[in-house]
């Protein structure tokens, strides 16, 4: 598992073996309530026996419970721009809005919406054609040769989530890139999607879920993540049923609720001066 570290890189030299030992003691050995054991391709009783033999001796420290260490998240929106030389020379822009988290009813409609928007890069790794009928491919990439990439993005946490669109272009086109993102988001809020693209989005999402779960590596990770987030696991049949239950009206209302919140703007590139100011972007959705 790879985790993104937001701390300053110069602090790496200050880490010592004792720091890692302290971390493991606090969050693993003294906090077994936070542990989830999952497995694929192994019998349930055998897995329970292995977990009991190797982890059964761990004792919970009451002050280490998750309830005592986590504060509720409050979404605020805002902007963050980084003037930084990129390998490709493009400026990357993202605009997103708050939606519900893992435990909300926004989860499945948001996944369908991400499938509908789709998108990708002007260069398709592994062969052309993937996602070419998604909205961002048809309405952004295919109509604007200067767009390097345009893709739906989505992040979920327990209490809140974020959904939006990312795009990249040469620096001088950054303002136009942001406007294209705006137009796509407002279009979703002003009119329902067509039956054809809606049905395609649901089928693509269902196929993606089922295909990924064919891998044992993905399967046991999915079980572990669901146990951590929900305390139980939904099988593929339940997931498919929830996807089929999503309506076009669900997507419309999801986007309308989202854009009522302050936007989140992020940009990174060699020259971010062409990216519109945050207040201007906020007025777009007012």
Residue spans for each PLM region:
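Charge-rich, well-structured scaffold segments of protease-associated domains
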Residues: 1-74, 83, 89-94, 99-101, ...
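Short, charged helix-to-loop "capping" segments that act as catalytic/coupling loops
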Residues: 32, 41-43, 86, 121-132
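M16/MPP (pitrilysin/insulinase) zinc-metallopeptidase core fold and M16-derived inactive scaffolds
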Residues: 118-146
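Active/ligand-binding-proximal structured segments within catalytic/core domains
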Residues: 95, 105-118
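Short, charged, low-complexity patches
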Residues: 106-110, 129, 133, 171-178
């Amino acid at each position: 598992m790879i985790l993104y570290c937001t701390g300053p890189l110069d602090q790496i030299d200050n880490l010592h073996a004792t720091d890692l030992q302290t971390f493991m003691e606090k969050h693993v050995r003294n906090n077994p309530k936070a542990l989830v054991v999952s497995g694929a391709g192994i019998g349930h009783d055998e897995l329970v026996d292995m977990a009991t033999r190797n982890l059964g001796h761990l004792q919970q420290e009451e002050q280490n419970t998750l309830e005592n260490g986590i504060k509720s998240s409050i979404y605020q929106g805002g902007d963050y721009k980084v003037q930084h030389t990129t390998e490709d020379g493009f400026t990357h822009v993202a605009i997103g809005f708050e939606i519900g988290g893992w435990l909300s009813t926004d989860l499945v409609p948001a996944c369908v919406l991400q499938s509908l928007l789709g998108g990708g890069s002007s260069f398709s790794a592994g062969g052309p054609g993937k996602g070419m009928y998604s909205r961002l491919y048809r309405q952004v990439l295919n109509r604007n040769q200067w767009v390097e990439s345009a893709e739906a993005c989505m992040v979920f946490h327990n209490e809140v989530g974020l959904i939006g669109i990312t795009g990249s272009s040469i620096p001088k086109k950054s303002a136009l890139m942001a406007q294209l993102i705006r137009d796509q988001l407002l279009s979703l809020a002003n009119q329902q999607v067509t039956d054809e693209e809606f049905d395609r989005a649901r089928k693509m999402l269902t196929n993606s879920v089922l295909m990924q779960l064919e891998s044992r590596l993905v399967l046991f990770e999915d079980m572990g993540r669901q146990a951590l987030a929900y305390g139980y696991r939904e099988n593929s049949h339940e997931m498919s049923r929830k996807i089929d239950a999503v309506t076009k009206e669900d997507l419309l209302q999801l986007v309308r609720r989202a854009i009522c919140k302050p936007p989140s703007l992020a940009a990174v590139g060699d020259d971010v001066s062409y990216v519109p100011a945050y207040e201007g972007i906020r007025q777009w959705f007012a």
